[in-house]
Amino acid sequence: MSQENSNVPALKRTESKYKIGRVKSLPTVQIDEKTGDSYIELAPRSEGKIYGCTTFQGNYKEEEKLGQGTFGEVYKGLHLQTQRKVAMKRIIVNQENDLFPITAQREITILKRLNHKNIIKLLEMVYDFPPESNNKDYAQFNQNNSANPPAVPKKFFYMILPYMVADLSGILHNPRIELKMADIKNMMKQILEGVNFIHCSKFMHRDIKTANLLIDHNGVLKLADFGLARQYYGSPPNIKFPGSAGSGAKYTSVVVTRWYRAPELVLGDKYYTTAVDIWGVGCVFAEFFEKKPILQGKTDIDQGHVIFKLMGTPDERTWELAKYLPGAELTKTEYKSTIDERFGKHLTPTGLSFLKGLLALDPYKRLTAMSAMKHPFFQEEPLAADRLTLPCEESHEADIKRYKEELHEAMSQKGPSAPPGHIKEATPSPAKFEKKSGIKREQPYQSNQKNDQYPIKRQKFNQNPSVPHPQPKANRYGGSSLPSGPKYGRYEGNNHSGSLRNRITPSNMGTHSNPRAENMGSKPYQSEGRYSSNEDRKNGYNRGYSSSVNSRYNNRAAFNETEDQSITTTTLNRYRHKGYHDNNQSQTRLQGHSSLPGKPTSKYNSTQTNIPYRRTEIPNPNEYNASKLGSQDTKKNDYPKHSETQKQQNNEEKKIHSEQKDIADLY
């Protein structure tokens, strides 16, 4: 009785606590006729759903397409319930009968097992139609029974990942983002922490590069794209040695993007270690300073030569086992290391030692992630920033093309400019000129009229426009008396050749007007006539300046009769081009011109074209007549002697003339 009574309450408690529902029928076990193995056949889930996957409808909304490549499309989306931005990565299945890709299977499995702040997190899997596809057209076809049915949409697998505002590749190519050494150290520490966690979890990433290093809006860096990652079976890494491949384990050597591929992979080693990821970290660290991949090989063989050009050809000291690898032929070409010259200007000796440790040729001498985090490089100033702060602008790898187009457009609209402050120091503004002498200088011309093509002050040449301009005096050959041609400098407005018969002689020298200035309403000015006697040399007239300089000067600084005419006239006469006349040849020759017949009558040799300027009292040029200009009574050495003060004034006036010439060239 006691036993029966004790069992009754127990049954009541069981009935009240547990509810028996509908029992699921077990699938029928079948036996394979060929192999004899037993198996069960699973029926597909209703509505085409996959276990562990959700759909876009009611859960996610696509916003824009971020990019497209060999991996497929990546969309920027929004989780409707939490309003959280996500990235939706499509997994490619090339053919209808293909199985689920092994790379995607590895990536999903590894991301489910890794949980670290510096590793991207897999939020969810989606199995649905592409976001941009429209299923309404296909539904209407079934209702209307149209003759031309639309293409049946295909479902794909999508990985739902957190949306990251930037990747390291986009940041390095963004011209508006400038990274400091404290920011670089902050990102390097985050990269090494993530890589160390992956290696200690007995995985190898095998695709470390700037495009796979993502950064969120809080400045947290995360490693992404584990499509090439895999598990290794050897011992995990420590402070000295990397994680080993394991006994008898052989891996494929065609991994890692070529420009970030370690030398042991280039030489065909299939028993590599976790050190292949450390080489990629070193390439990323060096890329901070050159803003581009540092080892850009065109082929797999060329990649080996590029590596050895930077680090030097391996020998018994740097990499003893390199000669036993399948691609050891590459090590026969002798190269010297250039890493010191290439990166020594960017890094301190400690930073250069850190880079060499990451890029050591021997994988067993290469730094591990654990030892790299303890390197003295992170203890010296400046220390790593506590938090990475970046501009609000999003920067992805897909934006690099846009950055290059913006730079090309800016360069096409803007001409090449000198460095800041260069133009200001070389050609200062005329208003800021230091007044070195009593000579009055003209101000630069600023016109509001569109037709003005030359910087000339109109009021300086013609204060009364009603006065007609005299025509230039014609010489006996019917042309202008102004000489031209490559031998005698540049004379605007003269179309005659530079023959000897068109040169100015004392008989045809007079007052002429510049045709270019005449078209602009300018006032006639005195010609570029050359004084041609030895007496002129005695009086100190300078013949060394080229005719083009005098033409530009007279166009810009012709004297103004309403102002101080004595100063302006003296200024003009000082900078006029002077020549001399040889009565024996009855022709005027330029001083020192070796191509003309006859010998120069001065003491300067034929190769000297610029005669030093000599200052003396200059009389009014209108007082010179032909007889005075043609006289040759003065001896060669009868030059006036000048004091040191006069020589100093001459040098100052030379500088002023050079400055005025530079201003004329600018306009």
Swiss-Prot record:
The keyword Secreted does not apply. It comes from Candida glabrata (strain ATCC 2001 / BCRC 20586 / JCM 3761 / NBRC 0622 / NRRL Y-65 / CBS 138). It comes from the Eukaryota. One of its GO terms (molecular function) is cyclin-dependent protein serine/threonine kinase activity. The active site is at 207 (proton acceptor). Residues 408-667 are annotated as: Disordered. It catalyses: L-seryl-[protein] + ATP = O-phospho-L-seryl-[protein] + ADP + H(+); L-threonyl-[protein] + ATP = O-phospho-L-threonyl-[protein] + ADP + H(+); [DNA-directed RNA polymerase] + ATP = phospho-[DNA-directed RNA polymerase] + ADP + H(+). It holds the Pfam family Pkinase. This is Serine/threonine-protein kinase BUR1. The lineage of its organism: Eukaryota, Fungi, Dikarya, Ascomycota, Saccharomycotina. The keyword Nucleus applies. SUPFAM superfamilies: Protein kinase-like (PK-like). Belongs to the protein kinase superfamily. CMGC Ser/Thr protein kinase family. CDC2/CDKX subfamily. Its EC number is 2.7.11.22, 2.7.11.23. It is found in: Nucleus. Residues 541-556 have a biased composition (Low complexity). Residues 60-378 form the Protein kinase domain. Residues 494-516, 582-594, 602-611, 622-632 have a biased composition (Polar residues). One of its GO terms (cellular component) is cyclin-dependent protein kinase holoenzyme complex.
